[in-house]
Swiss-Prot record:
Lineage, broadest ranks: Eukaryota, Metazoa, Chordata, Craniata, Vertebrata
Main subcellular location: secreted
Annotated signal peptide: 1-19
Name of encoding gene: Wfdc9
Alphabetical UniProt keywords: Secreted, Signal
Record protein name field: Protein WFDC9
Length: 74
């Protein structure tokens, strides 16, 4: 009887490990590049979303001294 409990425990552990590994195969977030200009402090309020995207079109998420902000592509 104890053998079956051990077998069940090992099988359950194996399933949990595989689920953890497969979960890491999801799409990785894009790497954020440094902004091409040093923006003034007033742009520091325009933050990127948690998935490193910008809400407004024609804006790009980049990192600066004040964190990840959205800058106009123009």
């Amino acid at each position: 009887m104890k053998f079956w409990i051990l077998l069940l425990t090992v099988s359950a552990h194996g399933i949990v490990v595989f689920l953890h590994v497969f979960g890491s195969l999801k799409e990785k977030p894009e790497e954020i590049e440094q902004c091409w200009v040093q923006p003034p402090a007033r742009f520091c309020g325009r933050r990127c979303t948690k998935v490193q995207k910008c809400v407004s079109p024609n804006y790009t998420c980049c990192w600066t001294y004040c964190g990840n902000i959205c800058l106009n592509n123009e």
